[in-house]
Swiss-Prot record:
Entry's Gene Ontology molecular function annotations: heme binding; metal ion binding; tryptophan 2,3-dioxygenase activity
Species this chain originates from: Xanthomonas campestris pv. campestris (strain 8004)
Name listed for the protein in its UniProt record: Tryptophan 2,3-dioxygenase-like protein
Family: Belongs to the tryptophan 2,3-dioxygenase family.
InterPro entries associated with the record: Trp/Indoleamine_2_3_dOase-like, Trp_2_3_dOase
GO terms classed as biological process: L-tryptophan catabolic process to acetyl-CoA; L-tryptophan catabolic process to kynurenine
Amino acid sequence: MTARDFLEFRERLAPASGFQSAQLREIEILLGLEDTQRISIGNGCSYRDALKLPGGAPSSSAQRVEARAADGPSFKHCLYDWLSRVPIDGSNAPADITRFLEAYLASLRAENDRRLKLASSGLAAAEIEQLRARYAAEDAGAQAFLLAEDDPQASDAERETRRAGRAAMLFIESYRELPQLAWPHALLESVLELEQAMLIWRQRHARMVERFIGRRIGTGGSSGVDYLDQTARYRIFTELWTVRSLLLRKAAVPQIRSSAGYGFVMEGFA
């Protein structure tokens, strides 16, 4: 089917829209996409309003989505709750978690200093200063994220929980060669692979729509491809993606005190 062939019957689809894809909404809710992260569909309506019948009566699709939203915690909530309880270098004590994070931040700053020296070769003084400022901003951002100082509205308890969860993400990724961290690392990797697959699907969907209708207004009144491109910026597991920006090469990660405790345990052997 060509783009012009599609135009022969496209108007008959109105006012139907991808906004009415209840199954996709259920998947997003189950995984943990927050309402505050969603892009407005326009006209002051939410994605839940788009699922209702003309006149505002609830449809079966709307009821399914509402039931999904009310049905307990999301996968993201459960995953992050587990991560906040993962022992860091053998301890869950807040002071030990902070000690690990500060040691890691020191290694990150040292690594960025090394990168700056390598990249400065052949650059003009002004360019070196620009690069220095970028690395300084990266160091500051890493500290704010890992120590959970990036949300001034968070309570002390929320900040402590986030700090523990982010430390666990970093710990698992940085020491994934340790036997007892192998399956946690595989889990986190699978989560990112899942979200990557969703992002690829969104991108391909947007490009297919653009190929057939260009930048036209959507049948449901949306901005069309512009709206679809914005949804491709969704990140459900934002902290997991952020940690990827903070990883260090194996030789640069700080040594931990209890690496032996993350090895294999064989009963009956000394």
